[in-house]
Amino acid sequence: MKWKEQAIILGARQYGETSVILEVVTRQHGRYMGVVKGGRSRRMAALLQPGNFVEAEWWARLDEHLGLFKLEALDLCASRLMFLPEALYGLQLMASHFRLLPERDPHPILYDILHLFMQNFDEQFVNAELLVRFEMRLLEELGFGLDLSHCAVTGRQEKLYYVSPKSGRAVCEEVGLPWKNKLLLLPKFLIERTNRPVDFDDIRNGFTLTDFFLTRHVWEPRGIKQPSVRAILIQLFERRFHTKA
């Protein structure tokens, strides 16, 4: 078995005295593990950092084997991430989210969002929105997607303002107003295309929305906690948005 594709490095761990097991994600093959021989050497250290873009060639005698990686550097951007905590923590968060999905299962839209994030990692305000969209898509890929296309009560597509925590469906403002304390707020950027800059209220509401459904459908049923980096990242975004304002 053999394939070759552009990949983003998610992580690596020691394997034996001289090698590492590398974890990457690709568009067509999903999240993959493989051995990099000599990966613990100083020469390889810079190449194997999370966030780097590489041309990855994987091969194994049988598909179920761990396999070996041969890598070629494309963009060693990991060193630049160290100076941008939002980008570094964002990468760590998305890597944790990818691990909720089966290994070797392709999820091209999630990969595309990560790829866009890494190409614009110095644009914190863009990336805050991308992370919310990533978590929304993650819910969909796991089978728990939300329906934000129309109001669950009236069927209208206008003035959508809330999301029902019971059904995961949108609710228009006038219908939801009497029960607003029991409903989740719907960020406008998830349903409207606009040139208006996204503000932190929308970002916070987006993370609150995905937090609720990820906790209910994913983290609690699996007996795991949400990644600790997530709360840190939201605080960093809040600080950046307020600084900008």
UniProtKB/Swiss-Prot annotation:
Biological process according to GO: DNA recombination; double-strand break repair
Keyword presence, Lipid biosynthesis: no
GO cellular component labels: bacterial nucleoid
Record-linked Gene3D superfamilies: Nucleic acid-binding proteins, Recombination protein O, C-terminal domain
DNA damage among keywords: yes
Family matches, as Pfam families: RecO_C, RecO_N
Signal peptide: none
Keywords, comma-separated and alphabetical: DNA damage, DNA recombination, DNA repair
Highest rank taxon of the organism: Bacteria
Its biological purpose: Involved in DNA repair and RecF pathway recombination.
Family: Belongs to the RecO family.
Protein name: DNA repair protein RecO
The encoding gene: recO
